[in-house]
Amino acid sequence: MQIIDGKQVASQVLEEVERDIARLREQGITPGLAVVLVGEDPASQVYVNSKVKKCAELGMNSRKIVLPSDASQEELLRIVRELNVDPSVHGILVQSPPPPHIDEAAVVLEIDPAKDVDGFHPENVAKLVLEDETGFVPCTPLGCMRLLKAAGIETAGANAVVIGRSMIVGKPMAHLLMSKQANATVTVAHSRTKNLPELCRSADIIVAAIGRPAFVTADFVKDGAVVVDVGINRVEDASAKRGYRIVGDVAYDEVAPKCRAITPVPGGVGPMTIAMLMANTVKACRQQTGA
């Protein structure tokens, strides 16, 4: 059984990104990422700070813009419009989820698709479906594909089941797996899917992205399957230092022995998300500057 080490693969991606940034800087170009946060959600603050820190480590410019939790929709849209026309900013990310009074879809629509390094704008969604590589793919599914490639997993002709149909992971993951580059046969499962364990047992590759701790158990998985666990769930644990531990959507201890390969949580898909965000930002910089 192979444990797919996301930290190691992310490190390789970031080394490539750092080399790309160094080459761009030799031409007088420094990629720039702007991250906008509305409110004081502690988890969002951690995510934003980790992105800003990673930019600095790689030699990339970053800008963190924090708005109060009662900031208006129009105020947020105004900032996005300013960033759209700022030539020093190549990637724009509005940290999700925003406060309830903010219309997230409207914010995504306001971001220039050329700077939408999250890959959520309808133009980039269309490019993913059309397999137009000038678009941006959401970072988590892009990272999952890189993990499969790094682990030497053959996707062509494989039966893949993606559990979850979100715009952030499930749907783009399905499109990536069925693309002409991957050539898998894909089933997307969700809360209304019948006989889910039986369906999953037919899969060579399972991608779990539903946000339910330890949902995928051993009876979902055939011997020799590959399991990619996208879930990041906090579970109360009095014995843990913080009072909780992080677990995935897969019951790792019982599923792993059956697998040909599996991603752990933490240390699997998680590190790939920020690595692919950095890669998307460099790609955006290149496309905008013609470098």
Curated annotation (Swiss-Prot):
The keyword Amino-acid biosynthesis applies. Signal peptide: none annotated. Keywords: Amino-acid biosynthesis, Histidine biosynthesis, Hydrolase, Methionine biosynthesis, Multifunctional enzyme, NADP, One-carbon metabolism, Oxidoreductase, Purine biosynthesis. It catalyses: (6R)-5,10-methylene-5,6,7,8-tetrahydrofolate + NADP(+) = (6R)-5,10-methenyltetrahydrofolate + NADPH; (6R)-5,10-methenyltetrahydrofolate + H2O = (6R)-10-formyltetrahydrofolate + H(+). Its EC number is 1.5.1.5, 3.5.4.9. NADP(+) binds at G164, R165, S166, S191, I232. GO terms for biological process: L-histidine biosynthetic process; methionine biosynthetic process; purine nucleotide biosynthetic process; tetrahydrofolate interconversion. The keyword Hydrolase applies. Pathway: One-carbon metabolism; tetrahydrofolate interconversion. GO terms for molecular function: methenyltetrahydrofolate cyclohydrolase activity; methylenetetrahydrofolate dehydrogenase (NADP+) activity. GO terms for cellular component: cytosol. Homodimer. PANTHER family: C-1-TETRAHYDROFOLATE SYNTHASE, CYTOPLASMIC (PTHR48099:SF5), C-1-TETRAHYDROFOLATE SYNTHASE, CYTOPLASMIC-RELATED (PTHR48099). Belongs to the tetrahydrofolate dehydrogenase/cyclohydrolase family. Catalyzes the oxidation of 5,10-methylenetetrahydrofolate to 5,10-methenyltetrahydrofolate and then the hydrolysis of 5,10-methenyltetrahydrofolate to 10-formyltetrahydrofolate. This is Bifunctional protein FolD. The gene is folD.
